[in-house]
Regions:
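Solvent-exposed, membrane-proximal periplasmic/extracellular interface segments of envelope transport
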Residues: 59-72, 687, 692-705
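A general secondary-structure junction signal
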Residues: 53-55, 105, 185-187, 436-438, ...
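A short, contiguous, amphipathic alpha-helix enriched in charged residues
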Residues: 2, 31-32, 658-671
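A carboxyl-terminal module marker
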Residues: 668, 672-692, 696, 732-736
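A general secondary-structure signal for short beta-strands and their flanking turns/coil
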Residues: 2, 15, 44, 429, ...
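Accessory, non-ATPase domains that flank or precede helicase/AAA+ motor cores in DNA-metabolism machines
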Residues: 1-311, 315-364, 376-392, 673-676, ...
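Inter-lobe coupling/hinge segments of SF2-like helicase ATPases
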Residues: 200-206, 210, 214, 224-660, ...
Length: 742
């Protein structure tokens, strides 16, 4: 018997199956997905690899074939279904098989189990009381305290007893030696959330919610598995619909995965699921320790979990009876991986569901154009929620033209109308959210006399100013002190866009000194639990104003928020990215949706220098379909997804001349292997950031109406790169329908 092994070396030339003989002592023990140790290369170096299959017949002389040495210690096996999914990901998105296998492995190695010690009384009650009298008679007070506590409660936590009774460990050992008590260990799970299942209040669903639940349940009962788009306005009760769908799936003996963007994966959100489903729920997120993540996967394997909630990585939870995958806020760009393989959770979830006979539900108030287009084409079924629950009205939205504010002498980033409304809300003890679509204290630094922009010496990007007199590169982390004079002309006059969250906070505190202000951005939430602490403070009304970047608009529900101000609404509108209009519309609509979710009506002020742009006009009207029609006309005209398919080929190397030459050769090859008129090849060009960490970058774009045509060309290009030395010392990655233009 022979094992097919993918070795753990990320190199295109080694991206193939290697056959090894299975020794007699491992026969019957190896399974697909197991990590093993094998001899590799001329020197028979011991390396790890994964079993991807078995065969009865040797592909070459059996006497020359090497043997599998052993099963890797502390390894975690990949479920065989996920090995098949990894193969699909490699084929669909590029990269090597070992990269795909490591992607579908939620945890990389075993962690030591956490144990809890208990103390148990061994003596019958009468004998124990006699022993207690003896200890008291001998004035052995510590032993007497311990025995008295155990007579009161025969089994207790070891650490609790030590601290509560002020005992030394030698006292416990002495009674253990006398056979008075026994010390026992039991495994305890490192659970990231302490939950308490509560009695459910009866939920009265709207007719629209009931219709969505009925459609899904009827299909599920009939064995129909498909992809649904739950398109509902902000506050329409999508989460309640998800939970009813999950309940239906659980009643059929199946399991569910709920994907939520990391930025929206808050305690408040998770507790809604714990309250409904109790201990059958688990969670994954990047803030958990390796031990916590390992314990949750162990619970999954033991069948103790039926619902896994988490970001993109939770998609690979090894459930045996997967019945449903929910992707909340499906439009979020974080569902697309920026690491090889550059997979999208939406397409990968649909493929996993197809393999395992499950359904997929995508939810959003602002669906991605891809999802809405798929509904129009009949690939997904749309379920609509047009109204908020509780008959709450959508907030009134006003657009403030900042050009007019300048004409009237207002140079503040806060419009006059926003200031008036903020004062009004503060007097009424209502809460306010101010959203700024950027990070940091200020943007780029330029000198007005000559226009020089201060850039990172290692990357082709401008430095951002942070409080404390530092300029920081957000690509490589380079830091330097803020310059006072221009290094080119010596001018001291500094310009640039100076509106970061820190400066907004300073401005608000000056304008409204009586207000309690919270700031939520990457800097204030970098510590574990920082995100939850800020949200909890705001939810408990310990602050009047929350200022933040896009993380404050992601699905949070604060009933006392009646005013939302969107500052610099068009900051994301003029980036060199074909999705900029869509992203702007989504952010503005999601931000507006935070207002008026309680009993009091909400108002939204959108501040912009581009009030006539359709993304801003449609967001102010909460008109998704109007926006979709305009944006699809643009995508059709330009040949951008979803109207056609796009593949980016990103090439990096330390020698700029060699990289430029190699990119030209690769472009010519792509044209040669594509049929006439089937593919449009654009580039090669330098991306907007042409150099990062002293490594140069080039990009080639390929457009086609058919996704599989691009996959076929990608396969041709991979083989061409593998056999040509001109691509040595270069890194080449493929990205299908990229979320970010390079």
């Amino acid at each position: 018997m022979y094992a097919d092994i993918i070795v753990d070396i990320t190199h295109e030339k080694l991206d193939k199956v290697f056959q090894y003989r299975i020794p007699s002592h491992l026969e019957g023990m190896l399974k697909v997905g197991m990590e093993v140790v094998v001899p590799f290369g001329m020197g028979n170096k011991e390396i790890k690899g994964y079993v991807t299959g078995f065969s009865e017949r040797a592909e070459y002389a059996p006497e020359k074939m090497k043997e599998v040495l052993k099963i890797a210690e502390e390894s975690v096996a990949i479920e065989s279904k996920l090995v098949a999914l990894a193969a699909w990901m490699k084929e669909s998105y590029g990269g090597t098989m070992i990269q795909a296998l490591k992607t579908v492995l939620p945890i990389k190695k075993k962690e030591k189990a956490k144990e809890k010690q208990k103390v148990r009384l061994l003596l019958p009650e009468a004998e124990g009381k006699e022993k207690l009298e003896l200890y008291l008679h001998k004035n052995q007070k510590a032993r007497a305290r311990l025995l008295a506590a155990l007579l009161d409660q025969p089994e207790q936590d070891y650490d609790f007893l030590i601290h509560k009774l002020n005992l030394t460990r030698s006292v416990v050992r002495a009674l253990e030696e006398q056979k008075v008590l026994a010390l026992e260990s039991e495994q305890v799970y490192r659970n990231p959330v302490i939950y308490q299942q509560k009695e459910q209040k009866e939920i009265i669903y709207t007719e629209e919610q009931q219709a969505a639940i009925r459609t899904f349940s009827k299909d599920y009962e009939q064995g129909i598995r498909k992809t649904y788009l739950l398109y509902g306005v902000t506050g329409s009760g999508k989460t309640e619909v998800y939970m009813e769908m999950i309940d239906k799936v659980l009643s059929e003996g199946r399991q569910a995965i709920v994907l939520i963007p990391e930025i929206a994966l808050t305690y408040q959100t998770v507790m809604r699921f714990y309250t409904r489903f109790g201990g059958r729920v688990s969670i994954l997120n990047s803030r958990m320790s390796q031990g916590e993540r390992y314990d949750q996967m162990e619970r999954v394997k033991k069948g103790e979990v039926d619902i896994m909630i988490g970001p993109r990585s939770a998609l690979f939870t090894p459930f045996e009876r997967l019945g449903l995958i929910v992707i909340d806020e499906e439009h979020e760009p974080t569902y697309k991986s920026e690491q090889v393989p550059r997979f999208h959770a939406r397409e990968t979830a649909i493929e996993r569901a197809r393999m395992e006979g499950a359904s997929v539900v995508l939810g959003s108030a602002t669906p991605s154009l891809e999802a809405f287009y798929a509904c129009e084409c009949g690939r997904y079924q749309m379920l609509r929620l047009r109204n908020r629950t509780g008959k709450q009205a959508l907030p009134e939205v006003y657009v403030a033209d900042m050009r007019e504010e300048l004409k009237h002498g207002n140079r503040s980033i806060l419009s006059d109308r926003l200031k008036v409304l903020m004062q009004d809300r503060l007097e009424k003890k209502e809460q306010i959210m101010l959203f700024l679509n950027r990070r940091g204290y200020a943007g780029f630094v330029s000198f007005r006399a000559c226009g020089y922009v201060v850039k990172c010496p290692h990357c082709d990007v401008s430095l951002s100013v942070h409080r404390g007199g530092k300029m920081v590169c957000h690509y490589c982390g380079y830091e330097t002190q803020t310059v006072k004079n221009c290094p080119v002309c010596g001018s001291p006059y500094i310009g640039g866009f100076r509106a970061g969250t820190q400066q907004i906070e300073d401005l608000v505190k000056r304008e409204f000194p009586q207000a309690r202000v919270l700031r939520m951005d990457m800097d204030t939430t970098k510590n574990k639990g920082g995100h939850e602490k800020i949200l909890a403070k705001f939810a408990d009304e310990e602050a009047d104003i929350m200022i933040g970047t896009q993380m404050i608009v992601k699905g949070h529900d604060f009933p006392n928020v009646t005013l939302v101000g969107v500052l610099a609404a068009d900051m994301s509108l003029y980036s060199d990215d074909y999705r900029s209009g869509e992203r702007t519309f989504q952010l503005l609509t999601q931000a507006a949706g935070r207002a008026g979710r309680g009993r009091r009506p909400g108002e939204v002020i959108i501040q912009t220098y581009s009030p006539d742009h359709y993304s801003i006009r449609m967001a102010a009207r909460q008109d998704y379909e109007g926006f979709y029609e305009k944006e699809m006309n643009y995508r059709d005209l330009m040949g951008y997804p979803p109207a056609s398919q796009l593949m980016a080929v990103l090439m990096t190397g330390s020698d700029e001349n060699k990289l430029t030459t190699a990119a030209e050769y690769l472009k010519k090859y792509a044209i040669r292997v594509s049929a006439d008129g089937e593919v449009q090849v654009i580039g090669p060009a330098s991306p907007s950031v042409g150099k990062v960490n002293d490594v140069y970058r080039k990009v080639i774009y390929l457009k086609s109406e058919e996704y599989q045509v691009l996959v076929r060309i990608k396969n041709h290009m991979e083989r061409y790169i593998e056999i040509n030395r001109g691509f040595a010392n270069m890194r080449i990655q493929f990205d299908f329908n990229p979320m970010n233009i390079f």
